[in-house]
Amino acid sequence: MLFRSIPSTMLGYKKDLPDYDYDPQKAKALLKQAGLEQGAEVTLWSMPVQRPYNPNSKRIAEMIQNDWAKVGVKAKIVSYEWGEYLAGMRKGEHDSALYGWMSDNGDPDNFAGTLLSCDNIQTGSNAARWCDKSYDALVKKALLVSDPQARAKLYEQAQEIFYQQAPWITLATGKTFYATRSNVSGYTVSMMGSDFSKAKLN
């Protein structure tokens, strides 16, 4: 269940949204509706680096390319040096691209706002360059609310809009594993980094 604007571990994750259907015929109909009955040609940017959420960008790009070809979208896979790739994404030079994010602070706004707010089109962190005023209002309101349950409801409403509009498709989430020896105690794994202040060797 990846079709959300925030990860399942965060406040406000909406569990009850159904998966998108696999429907090539509907995809063709939508292309026709957009005036692209004869198909389309696009570039698909593939990251030149491995990331926890995307260890093989080239292979994933090839799989997408293959699926899109079935509905008449011809994708040319391109890649650039990582710095150039990031700069191009921020400027909106891509037609479509593989991209990802890892939370800086564990707050849902670090996904819902940082990656999708209208304001962040200009900063470049909204790589989808999507702006929905209703979504934006919910996310901005959530920043001003201190009650966790009230915040969660606002993010859930925002995710419904995200789900309907689909400014991006979440393909995968990464899992990071930490191992400790049996003689280590007091070490707690944290999404915000490693804290060894209470760790001991027994």
Question: Model-flagged regions — what are they?
Answer:
Residues 44, 66-120, 154:
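Periplasmic binding protein-like
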Residues 4, 34-52, 93, 97-101, ...:
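Bilobed periplasmic-binding protein-like "clamshell/Venus-flytrap" ligand-binding domains
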Residues 11-26, 36, 88-92, 113-144, ...:
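Short, solvent-exposed loop/beta-turn-alpha elements that line the ligand-binding surface or hinge
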Residues 64, 71-73, 179, 184:
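Hydrophobic aliphatic residue packing
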Residues 1-66, 70, 138, 157, ...:
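Append "and occasionally in soluble cytosolic enzymes with long acidic Gly/Pro-rich linkers
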Residues 3, 24-31, 58-61, 65, ...:
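Extracytoplasmic/secreted envelope proteins and their assembly/folding machinery
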Residues 15-23, 49-60, 77, 81, ...:
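Extracytoplasmic/periplasmic, Sec-exported soluble proteins
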